[in-house]
């Protein structure tokens, strides 16, 4: 008998339910034997200050994992000042020396991969396979910038009328970052690693849903030998984030919603601080009539349901040419029905819970709105389990523009499919959005690939593949999907001051500069 795709979590072993314990910054399913359990992150003071606190909830069970103190404005500024002090020595190291720390950091991540992955899954519900892959990707990024960062930072020699002309790259200072919960380690690492190799120091305020994953990164950097103050985590809420933006940082980075990005940009503009914003996405997935439909259907499942659909670069709007729409829909539905919803700690699970009740209710509201306006539910369509914040993988057909699932960013396991008369219409409909992060186009006419990529209004276009982030390629969007780029040399250059130097005959020190830049 075939197992239902909406599998019960009630059969999970008892060590995966109820209270989870934390020791030494790592979550475990059981308390260590004969060990008294506590969750302090620092030695208790004889004169403790009272903090507001928040609770982290396991989205698979609804149980509380731990309470965390909300950092005050004074504490945030103290962290930034510590980062400023660390910057003096860190920025004066050779890039090759800074790279050594990043390579050690990658080793530490791999060493603690299993523990870090379990923490991530407990905090935000990501299935354990994807959590492990996320830690591995963080290590890859650290290796990549450790191996390539020094070359990226070498001066560019330019031929001008001067005896010697070059472009130099210098660190900006302390960089402040506000990061989300959906990729709680990767989002931080892909910002912090290029920032650090460039000679900056970093203070990160992680999402309140996943603070321990961020603290684990702080621990990993410490174990790798990074100088104290070069990378710090400050845990808290919106007031903490505001305090970080207003602190004396040189750059503010945010990964979040369009509305939040606009608020951060306004706040940062008061002091003319540079911003790097990776904002919302409603990526189109376009299927041409000559597409390999089997490959496209498998790609649609992978592109839509990674991280339970909670990804800025997940495929969120599906435009399929009429002549193949029914066949594609059938293949898409067939692949979706194989997805197993269940305990995210179970390696056989494909879809875990959404991060919160609020997120689950938002997705449910978007589906109800679509159905009320004429959409047809082909697969799923309702809550998947009474315990935790589950929602079934859902496929909608007969979707129209007036439905929220097309107008808004749908941050969950819902795939709306729109049939269109031709490829030109598909591209026009795909571009009819405030978002422009990524796009996926499926066609066997590779002669048109470059032209199609040019026509789609997005920062990233993948032909016959799903959108992903890769340390070797720039990541970012257009329109309301962001400002600036992350990853690759282009992302690293967002985090440096670019200095023009021209030396004419007779300038003091000309020979020394020539030697340095050759």
Regions found by a protein language model. Give the residues of each.
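Low-acidity, Ser/Thr- and Arg-rich intrinsically disordered low-complexity segments
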Residues: 3-16, 21-28, 38
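ALDH superfamily catalytic-core signature
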Residues: 251, 259-400, 463, 507-512, ...
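Short loop/turn microsegments at loop-to-beta-strand junctions
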Residues: 51-54, 315, 437
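Conserved C-terminal structural/oligomerization subdomain of aldehyde/semialdehyde dehydrogenase
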Residues: 58-67, 286, 340, 367, ...
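Short, well-ordered beta-strand elements within core beta-sheets of diverse protein domains
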Residues: 64-71, 85-92, 177, 285-287, ...
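N-terminal Rossmann-like NAD(P)+-binding subdomain of aldehyde/semialdehyde dehydrogenases
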Residues: 27-163
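Rossmann-like NAD(P) dinucleotide-binding subdomain of oxidoreductase/dehydrogenase enzymes
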Residues: 110, 154-295, 420
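Residue-level signal for inorganic ion chemistry
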Residues: 62, 98, 120, 142, ...
């Amino acid at each position: 008998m075939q197992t239902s795709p909406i599998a019960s979590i009630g059969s999970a072993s008892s060590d995966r339910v109820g209270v989870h314990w934390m020791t030494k910054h790592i979550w475990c399913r059981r308390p260590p034997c004969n060990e008294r359990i506590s969750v302090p992150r620092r030695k208790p003071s004889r004169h403790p200050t009272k903090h507001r606190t928040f609770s982290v909830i396991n989205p698979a069970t609804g149980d509380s994992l731990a309470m965390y103190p909300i950092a005050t404005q004074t504490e945030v500024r103290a962290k930034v000042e510590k980062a400023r002090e660390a910057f003096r020595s860190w920025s004066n190291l050779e890039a090759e020396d800074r790279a050594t720390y990043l390579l050690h950091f990658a080793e530490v991540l791999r060493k603690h991969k299993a523990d870090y992955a379990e923490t991530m899954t407990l905090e935000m519900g990501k299935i354990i396979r994807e959590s492990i892959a996320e830690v591995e990707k963080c290590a890859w990024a650290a290796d990549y910038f450790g191996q390539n960062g020094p070359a990226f930072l070498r001066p560019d020699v330019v031929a001008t009328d001067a005896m010697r002309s070059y472009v130099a790259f210098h660190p900006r200072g302390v960089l402040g970052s506000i990061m989300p919960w959906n990729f709680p380690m990767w989002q931080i690492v892909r910002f912090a690693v290029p920032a650090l190799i460039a000679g900056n120091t970093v203070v990160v305020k992680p999402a309140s849903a996943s603070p321990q994953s961020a603290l684990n990164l702080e621990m990993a950097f410490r174990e790798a030998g990074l100088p104290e103050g070069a990378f710090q985590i400050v845990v808290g809420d919106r007031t903490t984030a505001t305090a970080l933006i207003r602190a004396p940082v040189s750059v503010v980075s945010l990964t979040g919603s369009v509305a939040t990005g606009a608020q951060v940009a306004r706040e940062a503009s008061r002091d003319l601080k540079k911003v790097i914003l990776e904002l919302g996405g409603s990526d189109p997935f376009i299927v041409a009539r000559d597409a390999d439909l089997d490959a496209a259907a498998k790609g649609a499942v992978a592109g839509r349901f990674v991280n339970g659909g909670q990804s800025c670069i997940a495929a969120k709007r599906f435009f399929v040419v009429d002549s193949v729409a029914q066949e594609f829909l059938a293949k898409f539905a067939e692949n979706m029905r194989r997805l197993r919803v269940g305990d995210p700690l179970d390696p056989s699970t494909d879809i875990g819970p959404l991060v919160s009740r609020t997120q689950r209710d938002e997705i449910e509201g978007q589906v109800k709105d679509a159905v009320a306006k004429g959409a047809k539910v082909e697969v799923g369509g309702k809550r998947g389990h009474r315990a935790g914040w589950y929602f079934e993988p859902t496929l909608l057909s007969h979707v129209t523009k007036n439905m929220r699932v097309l107008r808004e960013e749908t941050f969950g396991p819902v795939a709306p499919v729109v049939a269109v008369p031709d490829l030109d219409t598909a591209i026009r409909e795909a571009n009819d959005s405030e978002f422009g992060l990524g796009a996926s186009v499926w066609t066997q006419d590779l002669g048109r690939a470059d032209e199609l990529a040019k026509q789609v209004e997005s920062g990233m276009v993948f032909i016959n593949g799903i959108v992903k982030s890769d340390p070797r390629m720039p990541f970012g969007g257009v329109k309301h999907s962001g400002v600036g780029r992350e990853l690759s040399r282009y992302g690293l250059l967002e985090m440096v001051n670019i200095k023009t130097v021209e030396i004419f005959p007779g300038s003091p020190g000309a020979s020394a500069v020539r030697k340095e830049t050759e």
